[in-house]
Amino acid sequence: MAANATTNPSQLLPLELVDKCIGSRIHIVMKSDKEIVGTLLGFDDFVNMVLEDVTEFEITPEGRRITKLDQILLNGNNITMLVPGGEGPEV
């Protein structure tokens, strides 16, 4: 697969896409009933992420809970989907 990426420059690998998102807003859907929106500061090979200016949306039995956080370290094991430039669920 890596050889194919070098012969086709228009192909973008997953970690390259995440790398292009550094410094911009990203919407993250988690395996649990949480969604997170924040500015991506950095990530590692396991897609653990450091985010700032974070809003966490969580579905609870009482309804939707919204939490604002300055900075977080997010474990990549719990990520289902990344949306570059996403603004999160409608409130």
From Swiss-Prot:
Note the SUPFAM superfamilies from the entry: Sm-like ribonucleoproteins
**Where are the N-acetylalanine modifications?**
2
Which organism does this record belong to?
A: Homo sapiens (Human)
Q: Name one GO molecular function term.
A: protein heterodimerization activity
Q: Which family does it belong to?
A: Belongs to the snRNP Sm proteins family.
Give yes or no: UniProt keyword Nucleus. Answer: yes
Query: Where on the tree of life does the source sit, at the highest rank?
Result: Eukaryota
| Domain Sm: residue ranges | 13-88
What protein is this chain from?
Answer: U6 snRNA-associated Sm-like protein LSm5
Please give the subunit comment from the record: Component of the precatalytic spliceosome (spliceosome B complex). Component of the U4/U6-U5 tri-snRNP complex, a building block of the precatalytic spliceosome (spliceosome B complex). The U4/U6-U5 tri-snRNP complex is composed of the U4, U6 and U5 snRNAs and at least PRPF3, PRPF4, PRPF6, PRPF8, PRPF31, SNRNP200, TXNL4A, SNRNP40, SNRPB, SNRPD1, SNRPD2, SNRPD3, SNRPE, SNRPF, SNRPG, DDX23, CD2BP2, PPIH, SNU13, EFTUD2, SART1 and USP39, plus LSM2, LSM3, LSM4, LSM5, LSM6, LSM7 and LSM8.
**Alphabetized PROSITE patterns for the sequence:** SM
Q: Does the keyword Transcription apply?
A: no
Localization, per the record, is: Nucleus
* Function text: Plays a role in pre-mRNA splicing as component of the U4/U6-U5 tri-snRNP complex that is involved in spliceosome assembly, and as component of the precatalytic spliceosome (spliceosome B complex). The heptameric LSM2-8 complex binds specifically to the 3'-terminal U-tract of U6 snRNA.
Give the Gene3D superfamilies listed for this entry: 2.30.30.100
Give GO BP annotations, semicolon-separated.
mRNA catabolic process; mRNA processing; mRNA splicing, via spliceosome; response to bacterium
Give UniProt keywords alphabetically.
Acetylation, mRNA processing, mRNA splicing, Nucleus, Ribonucleoprotein, RNA-binding, Spliceosome
Main location as per UniProt:
nucleus
Q: List the record's Gene Ontology CC terms alphabetically.
A: cytoplasm; cytosol; Lsm1-7-Pat1 complex; Lsm2-8 complex; nucleoplasm; nucleus; U2-type precatalytic spliceosome; U4/U6 x U5 tri-snRNP complex
